[in-house]
Amino acid sequence: MRVVFLSPRYPPEMRQFTRGLAEVGAEVLGVGDGAPDPELRRYLADYLEVPSIMDEEDVIARVHGWVRGRSIDRVLANWEPLVIVAARLRERFGLPGMSVDAVRGFRDKQLMKDRVAAAGLRVPRAQRVRSVVDVWSALEA
């Protein structure tokens, strides 16, 4: 199984996921914004260093070009800020895993509450605010 793993070196605990994937036989293709040290490198079949792992559009474009011609089985990100970019890559490559829509339901807390309420469960009253004026309006409601 060939796995693209986003940010295998940060946060530090991601190194253990990288090691675990390799130890169970996965071919791990790492993507991150810093060079892997020799200890981590031994668990990576290949590594793509990008200028900023947080630049979604750039990461998607670079990964797309980098894996061209290789079969990929999974795209994983265990660090919460990267789960949407992982979902976008999965959708682009037609791979299994959570979709962008599903992931947004976990990342966007207002959307999460709306979905839980739509399923018939009670949730605390809440609304999205984007400004100080919105905060005061919410408090007065």
Task: Name these PLM-found stretches.
Residues 1-102, 107, 111, 133:
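ATP-binding N-terminal substructure of ATP-dependent carboxylate-amine bond-forming enzymes
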Residues 108-141:
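Active-site nucleotide/adenylate-binding loops and adjacent lid/helix of ATP-dependent enzymes
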